[in-house]
Regions:
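Short, ordered beta-strand-loop transition motifs
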Residues: 1, 50-53, 73-79
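N-terminal low-complexity, intrinsically disordered segments
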Residues: 1-40, 44
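A residue-level signal for beta-strand positions that form part of recognition/binding surfaces
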Residues: 4, 66, 80-82
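Residue-level recognition of well-ordered beta-strand positions that form the cores
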Residues: 6-10, 70, 84
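Short beta-strand elements
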Residues: 46-50, 124-126
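Ser/Thr-rich, low-complexity intrinsically disordered terminal regions
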Residues: 49-66
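Broad, structure-driven detector of short, well-ordered beta-strand segments within folded domains
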Residues: 65-75
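Acidic, proline/glycine-rich low-complexity IDRs
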Residues: 73-135
């Protein structure tokens, strides 16, 4: 499954004081706002964005299981970023059932890539292998 995407961009600089909301040296709020807008334009319902210690989360409405995209700069860089889709496994468990995640995750991955490619604001888009993502 395509769940981890890295790229380079100067379009998403840190907000002043952003490192007070998440870990120092990490940022991505502008990127999260950009993605939220892009996903809305692609027909997804965005529930909101939120700060986490590792970066920013863009929550996507999905009735079957929690669905979100994490995004952050690579630690100590100003223009290198990674986005990742959760869940990143082909199935999630809910009570006693096993729910397939692949179709909706792939739809979101396709939209994520399209938002970036159509914007012209990023370069070096690269999907990471499962081994690289776990790295």
């Amino acid at each position: 499954m395509r769940t981890h995407l890295e790229f380079t961009s100067t379009a998403f600089p840190a907000y002043p004081g952003e490192d007070k909301e998440i870990n120092p040296g990490i940022f991505g709020k502008r990127l999260a706002e950009f993605l939220a807008d892009g996903f809305r334009k692609k027909g997804f319902t965005v529930l909101g964005i939120g700060a986490e210690d590792w970066g920013w989360m863009v929550e996507i409405e999905n009735r079957e299981f929690p669905l979100w995209i994490g995004c952050a700069s690579y630690d100590g860089t100003e223009n290198e970023f990674q986005c990742f889709i959760e869940p990143s496994k082909p199935y999630v468990r809910k009570w006693f059932s096993k729910i397939e995640t692949g179709p909706i995750v792939e739809k979101l991955a396709t939209a994520l890539e399209a938002v970036f490619l159509q914007s012209g604001k990023v370069s070096g888009l690269r999907w990471l292998s499962d081994d690289e993502a776990r790295g």
